[in-house]
C-alpha cells in the first residue's frame, strides 16, 4: 500500500490521482511506503535539474530518495518530480500514448526511489526489464520498443 501525496504545480493537464496511485503501487516492492509526486513546469524542473544534477534544462523525472538512518523505522520512500510539458513532448516525439508515458515516468521514478539505477549497462538492463514487466502488468506496451510517429 502506498501513501501518496500528489502536488500539482503545473497548469498542464495530467492524469488523475487514482492513475498516479495505481502506477506507483504497481512499482512498489515493499509492503508500505510514503511518496510525494510533484508535477511541475519546465522552469521548476530546469532549476531542480541544475541544482541537483548539474544539468541544463528540464528533464522528465527526478527522484529524491529519502535516506533513512540505520535502525530508524520509517516508511518515507522519497519524492518524485515530473515535468508535465516534457512528458507530453516526449510522448508525442516517440509516438506513444501520453498516459502510457506518464505511467512509465512514475514507474521509472519509483524504481529509482527503491535503489534501481541505469548508469551501468548491466544495471540499466535490470531496471528496464523491471519497468517493462510492471507496465505489462498494467496492460501497457514496452516503453523501450521502437515506435515511429505516423
UniProtKB/Swiss-Prot annotation:
Group of enzyme by EC: hydrolase
InterPro entries: MetalPrtase_cat_dom_sf_prd (IPR023091), YbeY (IPR002036), YbeY_CS (IPR020549)
Places the protein is found: Cytoplasm
Residues annotated for Zn(2+) binding in this entry: 108, 112, 118
Pfam families linked: YbeY
A GO CC term attached to the entry: cytoplasm
Cofactor note: Binds 1 zinc ion.
Assigned EC number: 3.1.-.-
An example Gene Ontology molecular-function term: RNA endonuclease activity
Domain of life: Bacteria
Cofactor field: Zn(2+)
GO BP annotations listed: rRNA processing
Main localization (coarse): cytoplasm
Family: Belongs to the endoribonuclease YbeY family.
PANTHER family: ENDORIBONUCLEASE YBEY, CHLOROPLASTIC
Protein name according to UniProt: Endoribonuclease YbeY
Species whose genome carries this gene: Methylococcus capsulatus (strain ATCC 33009 / NCIMB 11132 / Bath)
Amino acid at each position: 500500500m502506498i501513501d501518496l501525496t500528489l502536488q500539482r504545480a503545473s497548469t498542464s493537464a495530467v492524469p488523475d490521482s487514482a492513475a498516479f496511485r495505481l502506477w506507483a503501487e504497481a512499482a512498489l516492492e515493499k509492503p508500505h511506503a510514503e511518496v510525494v509526486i510533484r508535477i511541475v513546469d519546465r522552469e521548476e524542473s530546469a532549476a531542480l535539474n541544475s541544482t541537483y544534477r548539474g544539468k541544463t534544462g528540464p528533464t522528465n523525472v527526478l527522484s529524491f530518495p529519502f535516506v533513512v538512518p540505520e535502525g530508524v523505522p520509517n516508511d518515507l520512500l522519497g519524492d518524485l518530480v515530473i515535468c508535465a510539458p516534457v512528458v507530453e513532448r516526449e510522448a508525442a516525439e516517440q509516438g506513444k500514448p501520453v498516459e502510457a508515458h506518464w505511467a512509465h515516468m512514475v514507474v521509472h521514478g519509483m524504481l529509482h526511489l527503491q535503489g534501481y539505477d541505469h548508469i551501468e549497462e548491466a544495471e540499466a538492463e535490470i531496471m528496464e526489464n523491471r519497468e517493462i514487466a510492471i507496465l505489462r502488468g498494467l496492460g501497457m506496451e514496452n516503453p523501450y520498443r521502437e515506435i515511429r510517429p505516423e
